[in-house]
């Protein structure tokens, strides 16, 4: 099954630095009015996962969620998270450093989409016990075009 989520080396390095500085992190891609479809990074203690939020994957022990309506839009796209300069006006914690996370997408091939459909829908809502289990299977590095280590594709039980 193809991963739904990939972090570039730059995004992974920034995530690790932010996690060292701020503690456990969570990502959320909401598609809301203020930030559009920019991935937002928060301290886990500062963000409440909604019951319909979809867990796309774990990267370096950080869960990455997308809002339910956004997932409907991105369901057949692989998302690559990267970093660019220009923090701007953002609630995401990396903005203070003058950078921001961005997302790029590509459509899954018909074969990849079929594999995702066969695996069932991703998990939804806050998942503290399942997230711990997911972390045990995750490794530490990821980049586009590589073997996608570091991101655990999520699926239902």
Predicted regions mapped to residue ranges:
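Domain-level signature for proteins that mediate thiol-based redox and metal-cofactor handling
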Residues: 1-157
